[in-house]
Amino acid sequence: IDIAVTELDALANIDFESRQVKENFRRLNLVRLGTSGAIQQDIEVGEVVFSRTSLGFDGLLSYYEGRDAVCDLELERAFVEHTAWYDKLPAPYFVDADEELFDLFKDSVREGITIAAPGFYAPQGRWVRLRPHDMHLNEKIESFRFGERRITNFEMEGSALQGLARLMGHRAATICTIIAQRVAKDACTDYKPFVRRMIEMALDKLSTL
């Protein structure tokens, strides 16, 4: 993700002949469309979730200057306390999607806090032979509340996209079709029609910008 975002930013804002930043900044709209698993009982397979806030388990943003300026530190502290976060894991970070993009989509989607996990198995509470360090982390995630806000789903890229975009001054958002209900242990194998519908909806919305 950092390669893709950095190269897109460079194409828009770097003069490749002089290797200098261009005088006139060009702001990009970066929207990830993907699939996701729900971790709240009331979210059904086939629904579309807009990641109003992305929760990064990957640690990527902490390598960049200005990380705290674009993250919700109060939400971070509450989550770390609630989960008794294992201190050998990267520090989790919460970064919001662009508000203008949210306003564009809010009438057609659910909103929530979405985890961006750095792996498919243990980081999302799954295992085959190698067990996660905290076997109860998903239960803590499911029960976490911050006012009326809650964590709704898992995916794997959104926090890096939204965090880097905010640091660079771009607009970004993550929108996912739910193809698995992790609590109810339900999954959709024929999810392409749901994804196609999401893509068509997103393109229609983005064409109005």
Give names to the regions the model predicted:
Residues 1-93:
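Metabolite-binding pocket within alpha/beta catalytic cores that recognizes anionic/polar moieties
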Residues 6, 15-28, 144-146, 150-151, ...:
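Non-transmembrane, aqueous-exposed alpha-helical and coiled segments at domain scale
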Residues 37, 115-122, 160, 179-181:
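Glycine-rich beta-alpha junction loops
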Residues 73-146:
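Active-site rim beta-loop-alpha module in soluble metabolic enzymes
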Residues 89-96, 151-160:
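Polyanion-binding loop/helix "lid" in catalytic or ligand-binding cores
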Residues 159-191:
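Zn-dependent metallopeptidase/amidohydrolase metal-coordination segment
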Residues 182-209:
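His/Asp/Glu-rich mid-to-C-terminal helical/loop segments that flank catalytic regions of hydrolases
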